[in-house]
């Protein structure tokens, strides 16, 4: 079982937290070994809260708030939820080319008043977004070794909250004063520039940002503004109900 908090949705700006069960299995035959990953949302998510994608989604910069609702005009009142999410992923190696093909099957039930508002194109967009980010990380020749990332994580865990706040402060300053600040509702940026956002962050959240920034500095160019420009997705695996 794992706790999951998704990044803000590209359509509504909302984000959700929930628990899910996850399974990994290796399926072997005489020619190759396929990795299977399956996930199942345990129960209804926490109520959707407002987040913001800062600038280009490919920059992986996000802000989160405790305000419920959607950023969509006229829907700030909505109490939305993820009622159920299920996914199956297959990683299929091709020994001849040295590449790995990935198949993703996704089912999602989300909305409000127990009505599923998810359409197939929403799922497709989410898959393209995920695939572009995964591809840019795994194919980077400068991706740190797993042991290096683990060591960096351990190093950050040893720091107290005051030290962590000092380390993440320059990042938040760049978010609040940068050219992409205008892409977020004003209350987000006001919270960042006033220092309120930093003071509300807990150690886990700060460490997630610092670790992500560590990886970003190593892998260089990342996902383009439109993930579909780079990652073709077959729609066979899409289901919205």
Predicted regions and their residues:
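Terminal "cap-and-tail" regions of soluble proteins that handle hydrophobic small molecules
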Residues: 1-241
């Amino acid at each position: 079982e794992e706790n999951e908090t998704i990044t803000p949705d590209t359509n509504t700006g909302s984000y959700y937290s929930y628990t899910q069960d996850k399974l990994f299995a290796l399926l072997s035959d005489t020619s190759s070994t396929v990795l299977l990953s399956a996930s199942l949302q345990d129960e209804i998510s926490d109520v959707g809260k407002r987040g913001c994608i800062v600038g280009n989604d490919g920059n992986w910069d996000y802000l989160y708030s405790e305000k419920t609702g959607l950023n969509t005009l006229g829907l700030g009142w909505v109490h939305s939820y993820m009622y159920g999410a299920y996914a199956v992923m297959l990683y299929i190696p091709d020994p001849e080319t040295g590449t790995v093909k990935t198949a993703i099957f996704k089912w999602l039930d989300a909305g409000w008043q127990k009505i599923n508002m998810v359409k197939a194109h929403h799922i497709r967009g989410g898959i393209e977004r995920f695939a572009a980010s995964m591809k840019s990380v795994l194919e980077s020749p400068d991706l740190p070794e797993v042991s290096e990332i683990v060591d960096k994580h351990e190093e950050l865990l040893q720091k107290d909250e005051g030290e962590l706040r000092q380390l993440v402060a320059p990042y938040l300053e760049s978010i609040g004063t940068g050219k992409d600040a205008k892409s977020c509702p004003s209350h987000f940026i006001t919270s960042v520039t006033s220092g309120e956002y930093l003071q509300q962050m807990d150690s886990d959240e700060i460490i997630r940002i610092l670790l992500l920034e560590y990886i970003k500095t190593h892998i260089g160019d990342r996902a383009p503004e439109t993930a579909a420009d780079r990652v073709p997705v077959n729609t066979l695996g899409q289901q919205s109900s």
